[in-house]
Amino acid sequence: MAKFSSLIPLSRGASAPNTVNFEGGRAFTQSAKLELVSVLLTTFLEDAFYRTEKQTTEKLRELITKVGDPRFVAKAALYARHTHGMRSVSHLVAGELAKSVKGERWTKRFYAQIVRRPDDVMETLSYYLAVYGRPVPNSLKKGLGAALARFDAHQVAKYRREHGAFKMVDAVNLVHPKATPALSQLVRGELAPAQTWETKLTQAGAAATAEVVAAAKSQAWGELVRGRKLGYLALLRNGRNILAQAPEVVDDLCQQLADARAVRTSLVFPFQFLSAVEALKQGNLSGADRVMDALNTAIDHSLANVPTFAGSTLVALDSSASMMGHPQAIGSLFAATLVKATGADLMLFSDDARYVTLNPRDTTLTAAQSIPFISGGTNFEAIFQRANRAYDRIVILSDMQGWMDGGAPVQPFADYQARFSVATRIFSFDLNGYGTLQFPQERVYCLAGWSDRVFEILQKLDRDPEALVREVESVPLED
């Protein structure tokens, strides 16, 4: 399944821990609605240190039932799909609502609204058929059919999935949408392939021999790069493939990747380069060092896209054992980004906590890679015990599995605020999206998972704590 991310405001009014997290420490459970939003917007449905994908999927089903408000669930799914671009989780919610909600007029329009691309129809049907089998509810068929009828020939051809287990034509035959020229051509087998850069590469891969395939792909990549036909994010995602299959265009590739104007107009953030960096480290490709240098430069250019935050900021990065792997990589790069872009202070914490100074001459990526991880446990209390000045906000980057000394640092946080006479806002990132909270006070927010909109939402919460909840509630859902 795809990855999901974002953050939510913390439930208020809790005065004592009321749940136990995966390591047995104290934590605070969100209300069912807030926990649902948290899980819907989290990126990590892949196996995590404490939870597997299957467990997370089951948790979603439980929360949908626990919330007991199908319209809220539907609004949250629409918000996740259209505001944050989350795909697989919206398919799951649509399938679950199709099974559990009967006789409601709004459901047909919801199923039509949840579809943003033609393959959303196929994924939603695939989920329902895999979990519940036939028959498919009429409201789901009618809603998805109405969505299919919106797409033109190019869109239908692009997502037809001719070689997939469940094809576009299978979806059309199942839901019987209103006939359109594009869908009629699809059913008759007369729809021409969409001409995209993906199909150009697919056509190159259909050559008869391995040698011809390699030559065709090299030519295809070369034409795409030299002709500047790839958007910046597509160039970033495919950098390693381009280097491997068309090394002769490495100069053009590096020039486009490091182009300051392209980076800034794409609004890409530093942490969005992480996958490209990790992919480039695989193998021993000629020219990889040059591309890595270009990525280093591009990451520094992308600091201009990071919003500023008024006042002082402390970034507290968890360096405990369970952070190893992707949470460590994304946490380090995000921490270095905030330090470089906003002048934030940096603290590492595990069994204890200490301030760390990054070399200002290092690039953002080099600075992130220089941050030492020392393993140990996760002592959230140490952050507030070691903080030596008043901060307007403290950003905590962790997998949220606090267990040292009971886990929840309620009293140390209160003592810190009293010591410096400050009302600090806490933004606590759960990099693995486990759905438990560490703090019960106002001005404290659990941010579950990750997304490329994280700075936008962080800024929104910093200005207006109830913004996200209101946004979900205000999503239009027609009867």
Question: Where are the language model's segments positioned?
Answer:
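Short, conserved loop/turn and helix-capping segments at secondary-structure boundaries
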Residues: 328-332
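Long lumenal/extracellular ectodomains of secretory and single-pass membrane proteins
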Residues: 1-326, 342-479
